[in-house]
Regions:
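Ligand-binding clefts/hinges and TM-proximal coupling segments of bilobed small-molecule sensing domains
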Residues: 22-27, 35-37, 168-185, 222-224, ...
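Periplasmic-binding protein-like
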Residues: 135-142, 207, 211-252, 271-281
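Short helix-initiation/N-cap motifs at beta->coil->alpha
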Residues: 92-103, 148-149, 165-168, 183-197, ...
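Extended ligand-binding regions for polar small-molecule ligands
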Residues: 31-36, 77-86, 145, 152, ...
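Extracytoplasmic small-molecule ligand-binding "clamshell" domains
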Residues: 32-116
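Flexible hinge/capping segments at coil-to-helix
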Residues: 30, 131, 142-161
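A ligand-binding cleft/hinge motif common to bilobed small-molecule-binding domains
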Residues: 100-103, 117-125, 172-175, 196-230
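C-terminal motif of bacterial Sec signal peptides marking the signal peptidase cleavage site
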Residues: 15-19
Length: 281
């Protein structure tokens, strides 16, 4: 019942917004090129199809991973499933990583991306972002016994850092440890493996991943305490679909104000969120 009421409310607000845009919306919709017509079509297409195609990074628990049977799980999986449930459709997951998550969206392979992605101005040139549904900061992880405390300690040609392309961690390493050798891998799972094997000296990722992984390593890995960023983790959406973006913003806001986001965070991390999120609606 709550899902039906919520969905109905969102659709009403969406239609009111479109109708209030006046003559421009009417004249432009006849060309089939407006953001309003595209966004309504996007939402309706998903509902008519009966399937939400979501790109999710399944390489870094507890944000996203696979269990022993290969089934997806994690915070992003729960969020995507909740959104699909709200629309009354099934969830279809495409596994993406730092390099493929934006192309998957811009190519139309997926409708939406839940992939632990920081919203920033550079990425916003290619895609749209929702209001943040999580906040995190970049941290450094090293092996137990390492003398490296901060990123500047890694600025040496003898140092190797594991990073994934297109990530904030890569940007940080390039900016503050330019002399170090960057070892590029596909995902955070591979970053962790190389670090455990002693093939690299450090790696960088969101605190949500670093803290969880170090805590599960039985003392083998250590998360350094310094936070290098305070990043808005946002849902990725296609360009030109602003009413779809507005709909997703309302969904995220509802999840925050209802307490569902906090409960889901505590489910996966065992603690309350370290940063407060703001509901826009």
């Amino acid at each position: 019942m709550k899902k039906t009421v919520f969905l109905s409310l969102l659709l009403v607000v969406l239609l009111v917004f479109v109708s209030c845009s006046g003559g421009n919306a009417t004249s432009q919709s006849s060309t089939g090129s407006t953001g309003a017509s595209m966004s309504v079509s996007t939402l309706q297409t998903i509902m008519d199809r009966g399937v939400l195609r979501a790109g999710i990074a399944l390489n870094g628990p507890p944000i996203g991973g696979r269990d022993d049977k290969g089934q997806p799980y994690g915070y992003d999986v729960d969020f995507a499933q909740k959104f699909a449930d709200t629309l009354g459709v099934k969830l279809e997951i495409t596994d993406v990583d730092g390099e493929t998550r934006i192309p998957a969206l811009t190519s139309g392979r997926v409708d939406i991306v839940f992939a632990n992605m920081t919203g920033n101005l550079e990425r916003a040139k290619s895609i749209n972002f929702s209001t943040p549904y999580l906040r995190a900061g970049i941290k450094m992880m090293v092996r137990n016994g390492s003398s490296h405390e901060v990123v500047e300690d890694l600025n040496s040609s003898s140092i190797k850092i594991a990073v994934a392309r297109g990530t904030t961690g890569e940007e940080l390493a390039l900016a503050y440890a330019p002399k170090a050798e960057l070892v590029y891998v596909a995902n955070f799972t591979d970053q962790t493996l190389l670090l455990k094997q002693g093939k690299v000296d450090a790696t960088f990722e969101d605190s949500t991943l670093i803290d969880f992984t170090a805590g599960q390593s039985k003392g083998e890995l250590v998360a350094r305490s310094k936070l290098y960023t305070s990043d808005p983790i946002c849902i990725g959406l296609p360009k030109g679909v602003m009413e779809f973006v507005r709909y997703v913003d309302m969904f995220v806001s509802w999840m925050i104000s209802s307490g569902w986001q906090k409960e889901t965070y505590m489910k996966w991390w065992g603690t309350e969120p370290t940063a407060e999120l703001v509901a826009l609606w």
